[in-house]
Amino acid sequence: MEPGFWHDKWQSQQIGFHQSDINPFLVKHWESLKLEGKGKVFVPLCGKSLDMEFLAAQGHEVIGSELSALAVSQFFEAAGAKPQSRTQGEHVHHSAQGVTLIEGDFFTLDEELVAGCSGFYDRAALIAWPAEMRIDYVRKLAALIPAGTPGLLITLDYPQEALIGPPFAVSPNWVEEFVGEYFEVVVLESQDVLADNPRFVKKAVPWLNEAAYLLVRK
């Protein structure tokens, strides 16, 4: 899955992975991280997610990583903000209203960019990757996140053969085995969300579970 795949998705606005509302699990479980103060929060593969506005409204400085320049511009446009932009290495930093979106390749991010973050949030990053690439993402995330840092992970799970991702199915067992190699994993909640996802209903996917996990970097 090359960068061009995601650029094409944004250019054609085939962004079914984008949610038009703040994720309910984020609202319900963010406090589970028990963050002290209102520190920085890292959001990998953030797109133009409204979840970042929620995090900023909690007083956090949000640091998002996003490949698509179009996604970045659409986020700030929707927020009615005109970001200040600067180039740092091969990435471009866009900042406004407590949110900084780092435009460029997630896999080439420097650890220093997220070293000061007190928490992280992954709603659409892990599930964006097919199984053969997902482990590389987890390893990079683990390399960026300092030991002891908590995060909220939200996944989807369904019979993968029933639908061509993204989003891809990520089972609880996969999270325990591969994410658990680098993070302490606590299941916060899992529920059937098939009725709320017309694309999956239309494709006759028999079931769809959304799960929230509390992660802590080992």
Curated annotation (Swiss-Prot):
Q: What is its EC number?
A: 2.1.1.67
Catalysis performed (reactions)? S-adenosyl-L-methionine + a thiopurine = S-adenosyl-L-homocysteine + a thiopurine S-methylether
Q: Does the keyword Methyltransferase apply?
A: yes
State one Pfam family annotation: TPMT
Q: Which UniProt keywords apply?
A: Cytoplasm, Methyltransferase, S-adenosyl-L-methionine, Transferase
GO BP field = methylation; response to metal ion
Entries under Gene3D superfamilies matching the protein: Vaccinia Virus protein VP39 (3.40.50.150)
In terms of InterPro entries, this protein maps to:
SAM-dependent_MTases_sf, Thiopur_S-MeTfrase_Se/Te_detox, Thiopurine_S-MeTrfase, TPMT
One GO CC term on file: cytoplasm
The residues the record assigns to binding S-adenosyl-L-methionine are 10, 45, 66, 123
> Where is this protein localized, as stated in its record?
Cytoplasm
**By its UniProt entry, which NCBIfam families does this protein fall under?**
PRK13255.1, TMPT_Se_Te
Family as reported in the entry's similarity comment:
Belongs to the class I-like SAM-binding methyltransferase superfamily. TPMT family.
Matches recorded under PANTHER family: THIOPURINE S-METHYLTRANSFERASE
Protein name as it appears in the record: Thiopurine S-methyltransferase
